[in-house]
Regions:
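C-terminal beta-rich recognition modules with glycine/proline-rich loops and embedded aromatic residues
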Residues: 2-3, 9-13, 22-25, 29-194
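Short, surface-exposed beta-strand/beta-hairpin micro-motifs centered on an aromatic residue
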Residues: 17-19
Length: 194
């Protein structure tokens, strides 16, 4: 780590905050170099689903997004109420739906689970905003298999993860992106060991 170009002695610990006690000034620049390698976590309490990380970034499936604008008075639920005279047209509801398949398992090599994953770096976006599916400058290509029984539930949300032995379709290349760029997020995947 460097502050204003000078190395700072610090002992960062994974999963912990790093505190720098100093008097800060306008224009101070902090540079932090993080290890950037692929890793995987298994969620035993969530049907042995897996998540993939690239350094400090957790990855999500890249899902095309369909935006539907609605009148906020129609979509208000529970105790959501509008004040009399408020113009709801100035505060529309935007619902986001998947516009591409999202129900994939990850195909993982038994000996080297991340062997078939490929990191692709793209140009930084001209608007300096990397937090959208279209502008994210990092993608990871992987192999997935669709899981047809994993569907949107009756509330319009992603259904419960299927069992590991759920029927899966043919292998396909899929793209993962940093979670912060995805509005619709599948970040815990059923796995398919091959």
């Amino acid at each position: 780590m460097r502050v204003n170009g000078k190395k700072v002695s610090a002992a960062p610990v994974a999963g912990k905050y790093l505190c720098i006690n100093r008097e800060w000034a306008n224009g101070d620049c902090v540079e932090l170099t993080l290890p950037m390698s692929l890793s995987m976590r298994t969620w035993q309490v969530n049907k042995n689903s897996v998540s993939v990380d690239y350094g400090p970034l957790t990855l999500s499936l890249k899902i095309a997004e369909k935006y539907v604008e609605k009148d906020s008075r129609e979509t208000a639920i529970g105790d959501s109420k509008w004040q009399k005279g408020a113009d709801s047209k100035k505060w529309p509801t935007t619902e986001i739906y998947p516009d591409s398949p999202w129900n994939y398992s990850l195909v993982l090599d038994k000996k080297e689970p991340l062997k078939n994953f490929k990191v692709i770096r793209k140009s930084w976006p001209a608007d300096n905003y990397p937090f959208t599916v279209a502008s994210v400058p990092l993608e990871v290509k992987a192999i997935g298999r669709p899981v047809p029984e994993w569907k949107i539930d009756e509330t319009g949300l992603c259904g419960v993860l299927p069992e590991e032995d759920a029927v899966k379709g043919d292998k396909e290349e899929i793209t993962l992106i940093p979670m912060g760029a995805a509005r619709l997020r599948i970040s815990a995947f059923p796995n398919t060991k091959e």
